Amino acid sequence: MGIAECRDKVLGGGELTKDEARGLMEADVTELAAAADEITRRFNGDGVDVEQLNNIKRDGCSEDCTFCGQSAFYDADKEPHPLPEPEEVVRAALKAKKEEASSYCLVAAWREPTPEGFEKVCTIIQEINTHVGISVECSLGFLTRERAARLKGLGVKRYNHNLETARSKFPEICSTHTYEDRLDTLEIAREAGLELCTGGIIGMGESRGQRIELAMELARIRPEEATVNILVPVQGTPMELQAPLPPGEAERFFALVRFLLPRSVVKISGGREKALDDDGRAILRGGANGIITSGYLTMGGNDSSADMEMIREAGLEA
């Protein structure tokens, strides 16, 4: 089945098979992106979900994810940053709202929150709700059912917990927890009524087949948001010498994710400024309808004004 037939199947409410997904990844990337854009417009309109992050607990993570510069395994001398005071986070959230962000995500580099850390995060969320009025999302590691219910009760809209890569690739990426651990937290979040944000990182040496495998897993989960990062190798990690993806491969993957998740937010996340010549402008017309702006967890990014201008120049709306 070709691009047009797959597009029409999706527009008609159908779901693609793995063989059809495999065929799309072999198709002409320009035609594929154009068809993905048609699907995006049909189901999602011209709006772009603009998100800002706050890395409220940085470095010293106990997990050994080979791509991550925040892991204690690869820089044991790096001291973990303490959680900021709520007032500091409120100021940053107010700035994000002024810069037209539609959501604000609190991110913490740990396996799971300590009891004291979780309570402080809850206080931060309450203060943002009181003083800012922006949609709050969280990425805090593994969840218990009790904590998921608490976050839902505080008005948290969406919970991020990435799969990172395909199940078949995951043992090469991390040994301190399993793929099933990640799936379990997504299930706990969903059971609590939280929307799901999940995705991964492409360009970590996985095969094209493994990228398809990841995309099919995302299609099975059906998150409200799928977030796709492109690896930026971090010095001192096992991935520091990883070669970049071939040209067009990121564009293919974003388009495929749109075919598989026609109604979800598909977000261009970390790595776009370094891995893509146009900062992701073409992908906003090739399947994506969301971006993270104003920097990421450990590296900078475009400021919000540049990204808002990019969105407008693409004929879209923040």
Swiss-Prot record:
Cofactor(s) of this protein: [4Fe-4S] cluster; [2Fe-2S] cluster
InterPro entries, A to Z: Aldolase_TIM (IPR013785), BATS_dom (IPR010722), Biotin_synth/BioAB (IPR002684), Biotin_synthase (IPR024177), Elp3/MiaA/NifB-like_rSAM (IPR006638), rSAM (IPR007197)
GO biological process: biotin biosynthetic process
Lineage: Archaea, Nitrososphaerota, Candidatus Cenarchaeales, Candidatus Cenarchaeaceae, Candidatus Cenarchaeum
Subunit structure, interactors included: Homodimer.
Catalytic activity reported: (4R,5S)-dethiobiotin + (sulfur carrier)-SH + 2 reduced [2Fe-2S]-[ferredoxin] + 2 S-adenosyl-L-methionine = (sulfur carrier)-H + biotin + 2 5'-deoxyadenosine + 2 L-methionine + 2 oxidized [2Fe-2S]-[ferredoxin]
Function in brief: Catalyzes the conversion of dethiobiotin (DTB) to biotin by the insertion of a sulfur atom into dethiobiotin via a radical-based mechanism.
Pfam families: BATS (PF06968), Radical_SAM (PF04055)
List of residues binding [2Fe-2S] cluster: C105, C138, C197, K267
GO molecular function annotations of the record: 2 iron, 2 sulfur cluster binding; 4 iron, 4 sulfur cluster binding; biotin synthase activity; iron ion binding
Known EC number: 2.8.1.6
The entry's keywords: 2Fe-2S, 4Fe-4S, Biotin biosynthesis, Iron, Iron-sulfur, Metal-binding, S-adenosyl-L-methionine, Transferase
Record pathway: Cofactor biosynthesis; biotin biosynthesis; biotin from 7,8-diaminononanoate: step 2/2
SUPFAM superfamilies: Radical SAM enzymes (SSF102114)
Cofactor note: Binds 1 [4Fe-4S] cluster. The cluster is coordinated with 3 cysteines and an exchangeable S-adenosyl-L-methionine. Binds 1 [2Fe-2S] cluster. The cluster is coordinated with 3 cysteines and 1 arginine.
Binding site residues for [4Fe-4S] cluster: C61, C65, C68
Gene: bioB
Name the UniProt record assigns to this protein: Biotin synthase
Family classification: Belongs to the radical SAM superfamily. Biotin synthase family.
Domain of life according to the entry: Archaea
Domain Radical SAM core: from-to ranges: 46-272
EC class of the enzyme, as a word: transferase
